[in-house]
Design a protein with these regions (language model features):
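Short hydrophobic targeting helices and cationic amphipathic motifs
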Residues: 10, 15, 21, 30-31
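Short, Lys/Arg-enriched N-terminal segments with co-localized hydrophobic residues
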Residues: 23-38
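Hydrophobic transmembrane alpha-helices
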Residues: 39-87, 91
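Small-polar-interrupted transmembrane alpha-helices in polytopic inner-membrane proteins
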Residues: 55, 96-104
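Membrane-embedded alpha-helical hairpins and interfacial helices in multi-pass inner-membrane proteins
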Residues: 63-72, 101-127, 131-207
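Membrane-helix interface "capping/anchor" motifs
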Residues: 85-96, 135-141
């Protein structure tokens, strides 16, 4: 009975994940349709696939070297620094979402609903970062940089409260601190590295 239950759960999880990613892709195009971006479809899909693969691989590698650091309450996924790619290309929105989804589905230590909750938090953060990419303090899109902390604090904080217990406030705070530490330090460094080398006009261009 347990075997059949596992098969049913994983089958349902993969089916739900396919539907969810289809929704992410469709909603991304709908939300960006009014921006009339010069976009090469092949380049867009290639960027999204590469970003997804890098996110999933980096997170798995970190978990092998430092077990648990990608799934604890104060989780510090190094791959979350890649969120800044959403400032440069809309392909990062489905790319980061799919990368998060792949890791959460292939790592046994994630919470039961993390493949949906975590992916939704990543999608909303990436979308918000793309939308606020031109809102800058000095040369830094500071408003966008805090978006991963906000979305993950609320959604993953709620998930931790449901499955692990403790107060929502403290869980949300722990998640936010982990996100801020990675995105504000590593993410900011990656952001300036991309702009300094004009990679946003070459590797991350869509036309």
């Amino acid at each position: 009975m347990d075997v059949f239950a596992c098969i049913f759960f994983f089958g349902w999880a993969h089916f739900a994940s396919i539907l969810f990613f289809a929704w992410v892709e469709l909603s991304t195009h709908f939300l960006l349709s009014k921006e009339k971006l010069p976009m090469n479809k092949t380049r867009y899909l290639t960027q999204a696939a590469i970003i997804a693969a890098l996110y999933a691989v980096l997170t798995h590698m970190q978990n092998l070297l430092l077990p648990g650091t990608t799934t604890w309450a104060i989780q510090m996924r190094i791959s979350e620094a890649m969120n800044v790619l959403a400032f440069f290309t809309p392909a990062a929105i489905p790319g980061l979402s799919l990368g998060c989804l792949v890791f959460n589905l292939t790592y046994a230590g994630t919470l039961p609903l993390d493949f949906l909750v975590g992916t939704l938090a990543t999608f909303l953060a990436a979308l918000a970062m793309w939308k606020t990419r031109n809102v800058k303090i000095g040369k830094l899109p500071l408003l966008g940089l805090v978006m991963p902390a906000v979305t993950n604090a609320f959604l993953v904080g709620w998930e931790l409260t449901v499955y692990i217990g403790g107060g929502f406030g403290i869980n949300a705070l722990y998640v936010a601190l982990g996100e801020l530490a990675v995105v504000l330090v590593l993410g900011t460094a990656l952001y300036f590295a991309i702009t300094a080398r004009s990679l946003d006009k070459s590797l991350l261009a869509l036309d």
